[in-house]
């Protein structure tokens, strides 16, 4: 016997450690002829198992383990597919089990599918006779070798295999302990069965009967199923009048061409070209299906992106409304999307606003039917850090040890335990004791195994037939899922479309809706001008916080250097600012500002590269060059581009000669041809799809346009989308303030869960207030909408439900200013809390009873809290300051010291900052130094205090204190940081500065005020302070007089003139 008929692979989640690759390797070495995959209830591993078997020339048998029941008794049963129909029966049976969450399978279910299946009962006892008899007369019925001897039936040796070798036995109890969230010692007591994958030699020692061997061989011969890949499973689109899909598609396209007045012959020729390729490849239904669901979205208040990926290079997509990018206008190539010389399924990914994406999926489900639409499964795996913690937990490691393990494994994508073991600290932990060594060995054996299923973020499978005819299904959090991954589902021919949720589309849509509602202005984003100077000024200033694709510090720096003037500049920046092409940014910017420096290898390259100043940025440019120079068709050019990006030497050499020969036939010099080939080879590795860049740059431009023209609504919606992130909220509020937009405290009668734009400014969200959850906010808003605005603090306290009314909620709302609208100081309202909490809750809900039985309430008026305390409470309850940041306030008061801010300071100038975080570390030499995070009320920046300076300041610096710092600015990891050389407490710096001052300059002051007459001194006095007036308009300095250098005179100057107009020198 050279077949194993009962293998549980690692896709039997947390019930097997048998990896398919390792299984097949061992089976091939041992000489196995056939293997049967029999995971319990699921078929997750079928494609991988099938492919590995075929590659190893091993006969794959498809099966499944189920627990069959008659309602009284349950028996473990293995079912195997005899043929392709049997394989489909397994798809349907597994789908039914998983969709209905059945752990035991009724006899009737199996009888429905058993015609093309082989049934093998395991460890059958007399009590199972009724179950077995239900299949009486079935020819392909077997009992495994250790079933009860008194039962009649054909016998076959069948022992489940769940791990590879005997020394892997401990993996099963470990997996079960992880699955059951229990300790390994408790599981070990129950696990006694030997379930390793045996060698052929071990099988021979079993002395199996001839009947068992004959029956095993019979089963192997009977099972002849295979997975059918690359089937034509595209659903058919139902046309309105029974037309063929081809005719209906052409009718729509011609109508749109005329309707949109695209009368240029080039459009008609391009359309004919694309239409022929699409219909020749049989994809007309695909385009109609995608067009239909996008049409639904656009007519049902769901915003759709302008395009994504290479599909924006298609005129057919544009005319069908799938994209809003005219490919001829932007010189985009259809063959980059759909290549007739490399037949693959088209791949149109669609961006929907993320808050309404489910609406479109629901439409598709309703249109095609419940079992005709599904998501796609993905698998979470036991990766290094996760498996190390899981195994540590089941082995009884305490939390301290588990945290130590997490810290010892480097935070590196894809790191393995073996790689972590190379670190001395990790190795020392492993060998600290025997328990740790065992932990490490078990962890390594489980590392990488699939742990759980999840749902692919975007992929949706659509068919006009039930999907379980082609692949098994299961359920996930969002509904049905294929049991096979995205690539596996696509490989068998199923239509997959990515429905992606894009937050920025939700922001754009909300701005449009709110502007319409509040200002009665209809914003048509397809009609906005793409030469708006205000937009390009915004981009040139780098004011792109919140702008899709353009908000990182690095991109903002590039925009400032580039000074964009055209939409093409945005397209170039979004394409260049990526690893690889980033090194070409400086070249691009230099040439952009100095077009005369651009040189081309050959004049024929100029029309292709002129827009990018001789720099190859886009994949389409490579294709255009190959077509122009070597005479390649666009299909051939796309194949060349792909070959170049994959760096396959053999293919590259072949393509190189192909290119040079083609160029020679076109009359190009051989040396020039080689240089051009090498040029495109250099850029092919990171060339960006221009169609995608144009599409996403359009979103970036739209957001920039809205930011410029509707800033209140822009910031309100951006802020609403970062609720929960203090850092992002604080940064965005900071920027809004600097744009002179008023940030208003939460208002109990105006604010919502989201931020609200108004003609006064932006009301903060009630959701930003710490200690107030969503449900409380919802109840407050619901009550206000149902019964009108709150009249005063007492009215609010009476109307909100008792279950949410407490001191913490009321204090939070008061201290952030939510009740300021009622005209009482926050101190007064704090004093009133005890009154409202003492109200008789039994009568609160009845307004008449309340008025009759409750004494009239009144406020005990209190003077307002100090400004600093109000600011501190704002920071405490919101995470940021509504009013000016304390550092900004201090800066305004202390400008006479000649201090600067981080944003406008330069090397070794005094800068006023607050330290938000201080991280002290020890260097390799054992010296202390510190990394600090500073802010000046507007800008945040990292700072470094090296050991030689830190020893001087170590005891005097603390978090959330203000200092004057001097140092040198340096760029590190694309971010500016300050190397701090000197540090002063503000008062100490001021004392030193004033004491050493020899003169004072007063801006735009022509004479001293009378109060300084008594302070004047003669010019020869030692302690004289010279006073000068500076006339800005005339750029002229005038001596105004001298006063004594005394503190009281300094204070008098500061009180008399604005701090911004005084400079002590």
Curated annotation (Swiss-Prot):
Reactions that this protein is recorded to catalyse: DNA(n) + a 2'-deoxyribonucleoside 5'-triphosphate = DNA(n+1) + diphosphate
InterPro entries (alphabetical): DNA_pol3_alpha_NTPase_dom, DNA_pol3_alpha_thumb_dom, DNA_pol3_finger, DnaE2/DnaE/PolC, DNAPol_HHH, NA-bd_OB_tRNA, PHP_dom, Pol/His_phosphatase_N
Class of the enzyme per the UniProt entry, highest EC level: transferase
Cellular localisation: Cytoplasm
Alphabetic keyword roster: Cytoplasm, DNA replication, DNA-directed DNA polymerase, Nucleotidyltransferase, Transferase
Annotated GO MF terms: 3'-5' exonuclease activity; DNA-directed DNA polymerase activity; nucleic acid binding
Chief place of localization: cytoplasm
Pfam families with a match to the protein in the record: DNA_pol3_alpha, DNA_pol3_finger, HHH_6, PHP, tRNA_anti-codon
Record EC number: 2.7.7.7
UniProt GO BP: DNA replication
GO cellular component labels: cytoplasm
Coiled coil: none
Assembly, per entry: DNA polymerase III contains a core (composed of alpha, epsilon and theta chains) that associates with a tau subunit. This core dimerizes to form the PolIII' complex. PolIII' associates with the gamma complex (composed of gamma, delta, delta', psi and chi chains) and with the beta chain to form the complete DNA polymerase III complex.
Recorded family membership: Belongs to the DNA polymerase type-C family. DnaE subfamily.
Record's function text: DNA polymerase III is a complex, multichain enzyme responsible for most of the replicative synthesis in bacteria. This DNA polymerase also exhibits 3' to 5' exonuclease activity. The alpha chain is the DNA polymerase.
Protein name: DNA polymerase III subunit alpha
Species whose genome carries this gene: Staphylococcus epidermidis (strain ATCC 35984 / DSM 28319 / BCRC 17069 / CCUG 31568 / BM 3577 / RP62A)
Lineage of producing organism: Bacteria, Bacillati, Bacillota, Bacilli, Bacillales
């Amino acid at each position: 016997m050279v077949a194993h008929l009962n293998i549980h692979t690692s896709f039997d989640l947390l019930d097997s450690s048998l990896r398919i690759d390792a299984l097949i390797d061992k089976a091939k070495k041992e000489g196995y002829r056939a293997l049967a995959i029999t995971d319990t209830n699921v078929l997750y591993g079928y494609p991988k198992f099938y492919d590995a078997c075929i590659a190893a020339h091993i006969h794959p048998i498809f099966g499944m383990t189920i627990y069959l029941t008659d309602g009284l008794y349950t028996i473990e049963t293995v079912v195997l597919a005899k043929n392709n129909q049997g394989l489909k029966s397994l798809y349907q049976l597994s789908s039914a089990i998983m969709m209905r969450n059945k752990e035991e399978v009724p006899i009737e279910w199996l009888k429905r599918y058993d015609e093309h299946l082989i049934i093998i009962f395991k460890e059958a006892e007399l009590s199972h006779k009724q179950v077995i008899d239900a299949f009486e007369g079935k020819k392909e019925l077997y009992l495994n070798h250790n079933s009860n001897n008194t039962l009649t039936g054909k016998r076959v040796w069948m022992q489940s295999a769940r791990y590879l070798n005997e020394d892997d036995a401990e993996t099963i109890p470990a997996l079960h302990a992880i699955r059951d969230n229990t300790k390994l010692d408790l599981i070990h007591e129950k696990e006694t069965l030997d379930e390793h994958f045996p060698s052929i030699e071990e099988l021979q020692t079993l002395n199996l009967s001839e009947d068992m061997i004959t029956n095993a061989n019979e089963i192997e011969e009977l099972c002849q199923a295979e997975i059918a890949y690359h089937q034509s499973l595209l659903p058919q689109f139902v046309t309105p009048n029974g037309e063929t899909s081809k005719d209906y598609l052409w009718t729509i396209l011609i109508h749109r061409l005329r309707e949109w007045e695209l009368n240029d012959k080039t459009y008609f020729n391009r359309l004919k070209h694309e239409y022929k390729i699409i219909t020749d490849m049989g994809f007309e239904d695909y385009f109609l299906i995608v067009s239909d669901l996008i049409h639904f979205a656009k007519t049902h208040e769901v915003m759709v992106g302008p395009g994504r990926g290479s599909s924006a290079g298609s005129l057919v997509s544009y005319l069908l409304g799938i994209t809003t990018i005219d490919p001829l206008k932007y010189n985009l190539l259809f063959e980059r999307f759909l290549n007739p010389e490399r037949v693959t399924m088209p791949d149109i990914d669609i961006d929907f606003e993320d808050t309404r994406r489910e609406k479109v999926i629901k439409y598709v489900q309703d249109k095609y039917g419940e079992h005709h639409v599904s998501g796609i499964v993905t698998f979470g795996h036991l990766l290094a850090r996760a498996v190390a913690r899981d195994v540590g937990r089941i082995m009884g490691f305490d939390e301290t040890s588990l945290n130590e393990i997490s810290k010892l494994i480097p935070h590196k994508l894809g790191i393995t335990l073996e790689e972590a073991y190379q670190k001395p600290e990790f190795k020392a932990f492993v060998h600290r004791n025997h328990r740790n060594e065992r932990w490490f060995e078990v962890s390594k054996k489980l590392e990488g195994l699939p742990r759980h299923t999840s749902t692919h973020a975007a992929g949706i499978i659509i068919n006009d037939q039930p999907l379980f005819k082609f692949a098994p299904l299961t359920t996930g959090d969002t509904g049905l899922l294929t049991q096979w991954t995205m690539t596996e589902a696509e490989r068998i021919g199923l239509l997959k479309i990515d429905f992606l949720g894009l937050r920025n589309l939700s922001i754009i849509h909300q701005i449009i809706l709110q502007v319409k509602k509040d200002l009665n202005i209809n914003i048509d984003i397809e009609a906005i001008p793409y030469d708006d100077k205000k937009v390009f000024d915004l981009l040139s200033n780098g004011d792109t916080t919140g702008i899709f694709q353009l908000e990182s510090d690095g991109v903002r720096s590039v925009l400032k250097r580039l000074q964009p003037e055209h939409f093409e500049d945005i397209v170039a920046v979004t394409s260049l600012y990526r690893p690889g092409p980033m090194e070409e940014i400086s070249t691009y910017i230099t040439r952009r500002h100095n077009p005369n420096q651009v040189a081309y290898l050959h004049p024929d390259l100029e029309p292709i590269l002129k827009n990018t100043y001789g720099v190859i940025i886009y994949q389409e440019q490579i294709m255009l060059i190959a077509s122009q120079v070597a005479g390649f068709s666009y299909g051939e050019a796309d194949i060349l581009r792909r070959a170049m990006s994959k760096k396959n030497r053999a293919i590259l050499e072949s393509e190189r000669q192909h290119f040079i020969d083609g160029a020679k036939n076109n009359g190009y010099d051989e040396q020039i041809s080689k240089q051009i080939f090498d040029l495109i080879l250099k850029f092919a590795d990171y060339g960006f799809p221009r169609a995608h860049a144009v599409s996403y740059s359009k979103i970036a431009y739209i957001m920039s346009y809205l930011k410029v023209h509707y800033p209140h609504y822009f910031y309100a919606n951006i802020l609403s989308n970062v609720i929960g992130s203090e850092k992002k909220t604080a940064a965005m509020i900071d920027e809004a303030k600097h744009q002179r937009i008023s940030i208003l405290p939460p208002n109990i009668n105006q604010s919502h869960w989201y931020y609200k734009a108004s003609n006064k400014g932006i009301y903060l969200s009630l959701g930003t207030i710490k200690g107030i959850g969503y449900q409380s906010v919802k109840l407050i808003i619901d009550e206000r909408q149902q019964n009108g605005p709150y009249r005063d603090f007492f009215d609010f306290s009476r109307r909100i439900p008792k279950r949410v009314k407490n001191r913490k909620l009321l204090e939070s709302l008061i201290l952030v200013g939510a009740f300021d609208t009622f005209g009482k100081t926050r101190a007064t309202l704090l004093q009133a809390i005890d009154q409202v909490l003492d109200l008789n809750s039994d009568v609160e809900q009845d307004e008449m009873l309340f008025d009759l039985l409750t004494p009239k309430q009144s406020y005990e008026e209190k003077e307002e809290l100090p400004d600093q305390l109000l600011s501190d409470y704002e920071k405490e309850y919101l995470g940021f300051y509504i009013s000016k940041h304390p550092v900004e306030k201090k800066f305004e008061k202390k400008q006479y010291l000649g201090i600067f801010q981080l944003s406008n300071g330069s090397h070794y100038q005094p800068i006023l900052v607050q330290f938000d975080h201080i991280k002290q570390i020890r260097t390799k030499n054992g010296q202390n130094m510190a990394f600090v995070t500073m802010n000046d009320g507007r800008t945040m920046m990292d700072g470094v205090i090296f050991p030689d300076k830190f020893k001087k300041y170590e005891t005097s610096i603390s978090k959330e204190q203000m200092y004057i710092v001097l140092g040198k600015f340096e760029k590190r990891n694309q971010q500016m940081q300050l190397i701090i050389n000197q540090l002063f407490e503000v008062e100490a710096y001021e004392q030193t500065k004033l004491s050493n001052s020899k003169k004072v300059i007063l801006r735009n002051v022509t004479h001293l005020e009378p109060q300084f007459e008594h302070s004047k001194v003669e010019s020869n006095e030692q302690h004289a302070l010279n006073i000068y007036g500076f006339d800005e308009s005339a750029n002229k300095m005038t001596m105004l007089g001298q006063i004594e250098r005394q503190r009281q005179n300094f204070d008098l100057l500061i009180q008399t003139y604005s701090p911004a107009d005084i400079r002590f020198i």
